[in-house]
Each structure stands twice: as C-alpha cells, then as structure tokens.
C-alpha cells in the first residue's frame, strides 16, 4: 500500500492552493470543556506546518465525538463543536485559526475566499451532517468544493469509508497521505510484512472476540505470541481449567482450542500466563491473591497476570527484534491490578534501548505506556485503535486505498 505523501508535493505544487486536510482532532475534554490531552492535535502539526510553509491555504476537517440524530439540526450541540480545538491549535501554531459554524455552505466559502497563502482554517465538526458517515456524494462534493487538493492525515478514521476520508477523493486530485499516516503505514506494515526477527506480538484486552482477526493474522506472521488480559480465561476454560468468576466467552471455547492448535501447527510459541492475580470483586480495593492458573478459587476472578508470567514473558521477549503490543495484561485502571501491564511496558522500553523496534498498536496499550511514563521510549505509538487492528489484520483501509499510488 505505497501511497503518495505530502513530501511528494513541492512549493510549486502547493503555493496558493486550497488544501483540504482530514485530521483526527477527536480529543478528550473535561467537564469544563477543557482539552485534557492534545496529543492528536500535536500529531497533525508536521503536516499542517509543511503545507503552510509551502504557501498552501490549509482547510482542516475533523469529526468530534458522536453526534446523534437524523438531521443536521438534531446533531448540532455545543459540546460537539470544535471551538476548544481551534483555540488550542492557534496556540500551538502561534497564529489565529478561525472556525466557521459549519463545514459546508456560504460562510465556509466566504472564509476560504478570504484566506491568504499560509493561512489555516478549521471547519466545524463534519459529523454534524448525516452525509458524513453515510458517505453521500452530495455531501462529499460540497465538502470538496472549497479545495483544490486533498491530504488525509487522520489514521484513526482511515478504516471508515466516510465522506471526509474517502468520498472527497473522487473530486480532488492529487489526494495524498499526510506525515502521520505515512509513519503509521511505515511502522505497522513493515512490522507485519518485513520485520526484523524474532517477531513477537503481545495481545491483551478483555475479549477474544474483538481480537480474533488480529490473533489469526499474527499466527501466520509471528515467532512468538503472548496473551494476557481477560481473554486468557476463555483459553483456560477451553483447556478444562476452573476459572472461578473470571470473564469467559462461552461461545468462543472451540475457537480458543483451534487457535492453540494452529499455533502448534505453525511452530509459533503461544504463551499464556502460568499464574494470575485474582480478586474477590471487580473493584480497586478488592482482596487479591496470586495463584497458579490450575488453582483459581471458586468465586474469585482473574484481573492481572502474575509475577511468574511476567518473568516468563520478559524472557520470551528478551531476544526479540520486533515487538507489537495491543491490549493490556490486566485491569490496569486499578493500581492493584496494573502490575503486569506496567512490567511489560518497562520491558518494551528496555528492548527499544537495545535496538529492537517496539510498536504500540493503539487503544488501551497507549494509555498504559503513557501511565507508566515510557511512551517516549517506544519506537512507534499508533494513533488509531480500530484502524491499527484492521491494518495488523491485513485488511485494506478505505481512507488509504482512496489515495494516489506512489
């Protein structure tokens, strides 16, 4: 999936041109409407600054939250407006970033017409229009009508065929990838298609069902697969072990057996924890004890991997040249059950220091490495949750397929 990028566009290609840039500014806000984490805004800066430095007029579009309703009028709510984002972006860029009250229409056309080379405009939330997620040609064409070319830098929504990620490419050429998408493809694709070996994947999270595709694909590619999180109890139950009150997906027991058999057949080392930390309730202050997976007591539930499992996992990872991590080892929101996840985060930081490529594949693992304070020590932290998983599953992402081939 080699695509043209912003780097392929010169100042001559861009000077005075109106560039529609799809970004992912879906940042978290607190109760006062203040941004609590501006990572996604900062992640888009290299693309924005490259375009403005080449004299382009940059028109940004993003979704924000999930406005509900059949019509525009029902969807428009102040809490879904991009106002705080425009303010933060203007601080980061050191210049005003105006924001119209809509993403299409006369006000937008007038503001775009008034733009000077190097100016930045942030359109209002594209999801105020039902045509965005429905990817209607009318809405896509209207959105594209104010621009000359298109850049997609929103990896987090690249797996969705929406008007602002896929529809607009039918009306704007060239359509290229921004630096963020380029980096995501470079790391995630090469990790799967052309990795330095040994290649290990660590997959956690509470449900096997949400990770089936990724586990099946990884079994075809990796040398070692380490499983943690709530999903491991489905595997234990499939082996005939008592799992107490631990989370189990009864309809996935046969699948768990199939996956274990497939790993054996392919010569992949599939590692499940040998001990777990169990609790008498799902709570931060629950009573906890460490037990072997063969002796989980009735009425108790597993909420983290145990110290022996951590040691085994660390040993298995010690010689790996590439490691992909997706999903926590336990309920890391509760400090008492965050030990396994934190230990793995520290191990990966150590491996990066030894020259290994460490890739955090989106979702909760990102929050985990940030909580531990080792985010800076990872080779790559993916900004997409579902998009990262789908790419690791080998699926084509509509928002990327639609861009010009290199």
Curated annotation (Swiss-Prot):
Molecular function in Gene Ontology: ADP binding; ATP binding; phosphoglycerate kinase activity
Protein's UniProt keywords contain Ion transport: no
Name of a matching Pfam family: PGK
Subcellular location: Cytoplasm
Catalytic reactions of this protein: (2R)-3-phosphoglycerate + ATP = (2R)-3-phospho-glyceroyl phosphate + ADP
Residues reported in the UniProt entry to bind ATP: 211, 302, 333, 362-365
One Gene Ontology cellular component annotation held by this UniProt entry: cytosol
Pathway(s) it belongs to: Carbohydrate degradation; glycolysis; pyruvate from D-glyceraldehyde 3-phosphate: step 2/5
InterPro entries in the record: Phosphoglycerate_kinase, Phosphoglycerate_kinase_CS, Phosphoglycerate_kinase_N, Phosphoglycerate_kinase_sf
Xref: CDD domains: Phosphoglycerate_kinase
Principal subcellular localization: cytoplasm
Binding-site residues, substrate: 24-26, 40, 63-66, 127, 160
Glycoprotein in keyword set: no
SUPFAM superfamilies cross-referenced by the UniProt entry: Phosphoglycerate kinase
Gene Ontology terms describing biological process: gluconeogenesis; glycolytic process
Keyword terms, alphabetized: ATP-binding, Cytoplasm, Glycolysis, Kinase, Nucleotide-binding, Transferase
UniProt superkingdom: Bacteria
Annotated EC: 2.7.2.3
Subunit structure: Monomer.
Similarity-based family: Belongs to the phosphoglycerate kinase family.
Protein name according to UniProt: Phosphoglycerate kinase
Organism, as annotated: Cyanothece sp. (strain PCC 7425 / ATCC 29141)
Encoding gene, per UniProt annotation: pgk
């Amino acid at each position: 999936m080699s695509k043209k990028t912003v780097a392929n566009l010169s100042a001559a290609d861009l000077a005075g041109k109106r560039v529609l840039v799809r970004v992912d500014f879906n940042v978290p806000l607190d109760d006062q409407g203040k941004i609590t984490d501006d990572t996604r805004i900062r992640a888009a800066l290299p693309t924005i600054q490259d375009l403005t430095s080449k004299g382009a007029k940059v028109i940004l579009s993003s979704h924000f939250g999930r406005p509900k309703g059949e019509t525009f009028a029902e969807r428009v709510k102040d809490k879904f407006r991009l106002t705080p984002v425009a303010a933060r972006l203007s601080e980061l860029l050191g210049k005003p970033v105006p924001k119209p009250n809509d993403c299409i229409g006369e006000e937008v056309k007038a503001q775009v017409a008034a733009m000077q080379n190097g100016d930045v405009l942030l359109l209002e939330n594209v999801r105020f229009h039902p045509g965005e997620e429905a990817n209607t040609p009318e809405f896509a064409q209207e959105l594209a009508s104010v621009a000359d070319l298109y850049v997609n830098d929103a990896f987090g929504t690249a797996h969705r065929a929406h008007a602002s990620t896929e529809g607009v490419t039918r009306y704007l050429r060239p359509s290229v990838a921004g630096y963020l998408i380029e980096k995501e493809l470079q790391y995630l694709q090469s990790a799967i298609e052309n990795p330095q070996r040994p290649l290990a994947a660590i997959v956690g999270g509470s449900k096997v069902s949400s990770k089936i595709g990724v586990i099946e694909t990884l079994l075809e590619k990796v040398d070692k697969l380490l499983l943690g999180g709530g999903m491991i109890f489905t595997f234990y139950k499939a082996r005939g072990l008592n799992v107490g009150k631990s989370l189990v997906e009864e309809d996935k027991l046969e699948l768990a057996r199939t996956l274990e058999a497939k790993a054996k057949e392919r010569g992949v080392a599939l590692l499940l924890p040998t001990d777990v930390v169990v609790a008498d309730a799902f709570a931060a202050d629950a009573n906890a004890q460490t037990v072997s997976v063969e002796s989980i007591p009735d009425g108790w539930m597993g909420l983290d991997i145990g110290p022996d499992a951590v040691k085994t996992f660390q040993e298995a990872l010690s010689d790996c040249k590439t490691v992909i991590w997706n999903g926590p080892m336990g309920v890391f929101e509760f400090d008492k059950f965050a030990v396994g996840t934190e230990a793995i985060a520290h191990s990966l930081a150590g491996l990066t220091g030894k020259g290994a490529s460490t890739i955090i594949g989106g979702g909760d693992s990102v929050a985990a490495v940030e909580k531990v304070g080792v985010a800076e020590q990872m080779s790559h932290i993916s900004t997409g949750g579902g998009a990262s998983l789908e790419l690791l599953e080998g699926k084509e992402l509509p928002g990327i397929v639609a861009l010009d081939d290199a």
